[in-house]
Amino acid sequence: MIESYLIDKMFNNAPFLDEMATDQGKIQPHWERVAKYYEQIGSERMRQFHEEVGRQLRENGVTYNVYGDPNGMNRPWILDPVPMIFSSEEWEGIEQGLVQRTELLNLVLKDLYGDQTLIKEGHIPFELIYNHGGFLRQAHHVKLDGDQQLIQYSADLARGPNGRMWVLHDRTDAPSGSGYTFENRAAMTRVFPELIRENHARKITSYYQTFKNTLSNLTINNKENPRVVLLSPGPTNETFFEHAYISSFMGFTLAFGEDLTVSDGYVWLKTIKGLEKVDVIIRRVDDVFCDPLEFKNDSHLGVVGLMEAVRQRKVLVINPLGCRVLENPGLMAFLPKISKHLLGEELKLPSVATWWCGQPSELKYVFEHMETLVIRNIYRGNQKKSVFGGNLSKTELEELKRVIRRNPFMYVGQEMVDFSTTPAWINNKLEARNAVVRTYVVADSENKCYKVMPGGMSRSSPDKGAFLISNQTGGISKDTWVLGKSKEVAASVVKAVKTQPLVRNVLPSRAGERLFWLGRYLERAAYSVRLMRMTLLSYNESDEDIHIHENPVLSTLLQTLTVMTGTLPGFSEKKNLKNPEKELLILVHDVKKVGSLAHCIQSFLTNAYAVRDRLSLDTWRILDSISEELTRMQKSDSTLMQAYQSLDNMVIKLMAFYGLNIDNMTRESTWHLLNIGRFIESAANNCLILKGMLSKSYDSESNKELMEDTLRCNESLVTYRYRYRSNLEMHGVLSLLILHEDNPRSVIFQ
């Protein structure tokens, strides 16, 4: 396995440096243990490990949303079982470079929203800043206490042809990926525990502890222990899993824009018990969407009046509003000179070579070398994709030049870097793929410095020679190991440096509503499954020679199913009663049919995703299995037999969700609202079934069969037999299902 990779590297991968192999086909020293381990286990065992890594991530509910793809919601996170590895000596240099760059960008941020001496003295062209959508004039002279304005920072790095690591992108607005990084490491630790121990891969938990301590040290509204919320765009955002994961993991309240309001100058969280004052907002919403009053007026993701509350120092927002201006790729062309001016130092981590088209000589260079450059808009918010000049025809190049000439200050040309390759497990073998490393830096308020996560999240391209690497374009994530010189003890995120008073975690009103509907859809789905199973069983056992109109039990079941699911006209029409199979299959698997089981399950899952931070890991494993079963149910070529099997599987999974949460949830608002929804739905469906099944009288045998089906649908048949020990009688059935106070399925119990 390793030998074939080395041979392929020597003969087929010549243009690129490789992370594991030298040009002479030798293994890099810091890769030797990993390479030896992979060679020992072989391809078949490696394939099994790959499957196990995927299973671990699926069970943990790790997902990613892909925009513009009908099937892109909650797509399983893909992790390569082959890590990216850095030696401790090389990482020390990278770490120093990242700290220096963060300090530099922090100074630039302070200046741009302060005295603007960098612009006044000509170190940064004013057109580059004032034309960038990330520069928010409303944030001028608005700052956090202390020197550290930039609390979190991420950088995408790649190794260039000269062997040095280059900075490709700066991420300062709402840097993402740290939660996925933690999950990647957790999955790799479970699958390769010995390999991680033998290589002394450094722990990454210290990053989260530093971040939490920095937040706890912020002083606002005269409170030593501030209330922190994580502001998320919502379940459709590409990294919503991470938002829910971090908020749950670190004990923050997950909030959407609709959960917050500004009143009396303060930001308040709308909870089921009233308004709670918010002190710190960790935002995962792009800054221009954070306040529709002062920024993007059509935004539904932010909070009206948030900027004024920040301006009045009634709330702190991290990272500060307006810091997206630092993501401007045009700044990379000026950072070397700015570093000398502000720090008196050369950049330790160079940026990818960048030419800003707002300068005549640079514009000329870009036009003359466009075939070898990547053309980017300076503002990501314009939704303009990077253009690779080498992929364009002469006509397209001329058209691009005309576009740039209209607004030259809005474009940069960047060198098309030949990224290094790294081993990736593709098609059950090791193949070389170009890779980018995302690193993370956090402010340490106690020591007045910045600290770098000793690791990160690497991404490799699924295709050979692909340089545009992102999760949206199918990039595969990789755990990133920094080899330590000795074993180290993992830092606890839960354990803070100093003892802090208990902060009650409140339930936002929006989350409370979602929990209520989660309970309702859970019970609605369970009743639908049970009634559909009985209907399908009755239909399969019915005599083909007897018309359904002449079969009172089956016709009653079908009509009751229509009423309970709210899918009129349904089986109230004679044509559907003549041939019920088509309508039955629609009611089972058509997610577009409002009232169908598939639609009900989809609504159940939607509400569950919205309160992801309130549900346990085991609960998410069950939810993932429900989602997988829903996917199987939606196959258009399914038969009644397959539908019946799906119903059997689904009811077990629904009851597993019910049992796990009813037993394990603390008896607080979350538990009560979930059960209120359940009780209301249970009572309503019980009444509908009783009315549909028992309101008409037929022959004695049919009546008994309908009473038995009614009891089965309410999971009360065994209870009836033990209680009455007699034949089925209407009085006993109604008494048990309506008036019995100890029967959890009776109407009065609800």
Regions found by a protein language model. Give the residues of each.
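Alpha-helical transmembrane segments and their helix-helix packing motifs
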Residues: 56-145, 160-162, 172-228, 234-245, ...
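Active-site nucleotide/adenylate-binding loops and adjacent lid/helix of ATP-dependent enzymes
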Residues: 91-112, 131-137, 247, 263, ...
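Generic beta-strand/beta-sheet core signal
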Residues: 153-160, 168-171, 231-233, 255-257, ...
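A generic structural signal for short coil/turn motifs at secondary-structure boundaries
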Residues: 290-293, 424, 541
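Short, glycine-/Ser/Thr-/acidic-enriched flexible segments
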Residues: 26, 158, 162-165, 171-173, ...
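Phosphate-binding site of ATP-dependent enzymes
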Residues: 134-166, 280, 357-371, 390-473
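N-terminal low-complexity, Ser/Thr- and acidic-residue-enriched intrinsically disordered segments
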Residues: 2-89
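ATP-binding N-terminal substructure of ATP-dependent carboxylate-amine bond-forming enzymes
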Residues: 2-29, 151-153, 158-166, 170-343
